[in-house]
């Protein structure tokens, strides 16, 4: 999850089911909708359109977080500009990247050719 702990902006955090043992996961800037691999090493997240990760063309990165090496990289940038976004922020598209149950694939939302789509990304090389 993302939390604004230590008054240093959003950070990725982890805690027990009851809220105990709250701790940040590395020094990464938190954003969007994080999801973590069952092996505990890999995280994936998107960002909101108003955050610093958004490009001038309004595409946003899918950020792969490596807790094993304390590094991150953008796997890809996705278009989230919906036809209704100019009228209302409520018409935005959030990618919400998540790991599949078998941890071999990511599922995320994005725009393609003016239409909302659901994508599946093969992540087996990151096992």
Predicted segment positions?
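Beta-propeller blade-edge and WD-like acidic-aromatic loop motif
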Residues: 4-24, 48-80, 104-105, 109-127
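Short, surface-exposed linear patches
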Residues: 36, 45-48, 84-86, 121
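Blade-terminus and WD-like Trp-Asp/Gly-His loop motifs, strongest in beta-propeller folds
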Residues: 1-2, 34-45, 97-105
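Conserved blade-ending motifs and adjacent loop-strand segments that build the rim/top face
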Residues: 23-37, 70-99
